[in-house]
Amino acid sequence: MSNITMKELLEAGVHFGHQTKRWNPKMKPYIFGARNGIYIIDLQKTVRLFKNAYSFVTDAAQAGETVLFVGTKKQAQDSVAEEAQRCGQFYVNDRWLGGMLTNFATVKQSIDRLKRLDAMIADGTIEAYTKKEQLKLAKEREKLEKTLGGIKGMGKVPGVLFVVDPKNEEIAVSEAKKLGIPVVAIVDTNCDPDDINYVIPGNDDAIRAIRLLTSKMADAVLEGGQARNARLQTGAEEEFSTEGEEVVEETPAEA
């Protein structure tokens, strides 16, 4: 179990919310107070709610669910891509295409096209085309890679969405809600927490705050994955052991 400390949260600036004039009243339960026109998030609640979110993501990963990390704002792009890759999951960090979840079959066609273009470059098939055609295909691949590269290996809709700034990613959150996909999110003082299943109250604008919370969610995925692998291995060993016992029972004793 990865713990998050008050010291880590303070050092990363997770407690700084938005200006008091830019807030969503629904976030009032998560606000400690205001200082110099800025809302201060109640970090005691952040710690408690973070633990709930961490446990949920760990359990989901242990059950074999995939997690899609979403954060397309500039401050989140690097953390989202790097942490999702570190824990072997998927990400969207450039632009959310409408229907990415609700019309995944169509998006999958574009992913398959990207994979074909990758294969053409890898095996040299692209060399059979003219220079002009090669340039056109390379541009097409670059465009697809930018928007779909993070979900290239995702064969079906994810089991969980982890979102940085649900206000900015409202289409992604809306699609997840329609499909019944649980959403874990870093929710700042200007956000509506109603559509978020696991709210992590925190600063969703500071790079350090985003990195800290995103890396902890990646840790949760890794922890759940390790527990799943250990359980599967134990199950396989027990099955093998049982089969061995059956063989022994069926072998007649020597005279």
Curated annotation (Swiss-Prot):
Residues 236-255 have a biased composition (Acidic residues). InterPro entries: Ribosomal_uS2, Ribosomal_uS2_bac/mit/plastid, Ribosomal_uS2_CS, Ribosomal_uS2_flav_dom_sf. GO terms for cellular component: cytosolic small ribosomal subunit. Residues 231-255 are annotated as: Disordered. Keywords: Ribonucleoprotein, Ribosomal protein. GO terms for molecular function: structural constituent of ribosome. The keyword Ribosomal protein applies. GO terms for biological process: translation. NCBIfam families: rpsB_bact. Belongs to the universal ribosomal protein uS2 family. This is Small ribosomal subunit protein uS2. The gene is rpsB.
